[in-house]
Amino acid sequence: MSDRKAVIKNADMSEEMQQDAVDCATQALEKYNIEKDIAAFIKKEFDKKYNPTWHCIVGRNFGSYVTHETRHFIYFYLGQVAILLFKSG
């Protein structure tokens, strides 16, 4: 199990879905080392579980300004890695 601490910075999402995002990201970080692969894993899992179209950005340093569907947005840190996950389109 991972010792990465989850810190949710901003969320417009149910508590259950937030926990799912953290769990999914934890799995992705254990499975992959490349940020693009981590993002792809999370995006595909959320597309499967909560229907398309999800978008995921993973990294240590990025700015963002996105439009998202209501109740389908989360921005959080898992250890040193920031994860932005949102549904749009």
From Swiss-Prot:
PROSITE patterns for this protein: DYNEIN_LIGHT_1
Keyword field: Cytoplasm, Cytoskeleton, Dynein, Microtubule, Motor protein
CDD domains membership: DLC-like_DYNLL1_DYNLL2
Pfam families per UniProt: Dynein_light
InterPro entries: DLC_sf, Dynein_light_1/2_CS, Dynein_light_chain_typ-1/2
Keyword Cytoplasm among record annotations: yes
Domain of life assignment: Eukaryota
Cellular component aspect of the GO annotation: cytoplasm; cytoplasmic dynein complex; microtubule
GO annotation (BP), single: microtubule-based process
Location of this chain's protein in the cell: Cytoplasm, Cytoskeleton
Function: Acts as a non-catalytic accessory component of a dynein complex.
UniProt-recorded name of the protein: Dynein light chain 2, cytoplasmic
Organism field: Drosophila melanogaster (Fruit fly)
Gene from which the chain derives: Cdlc2
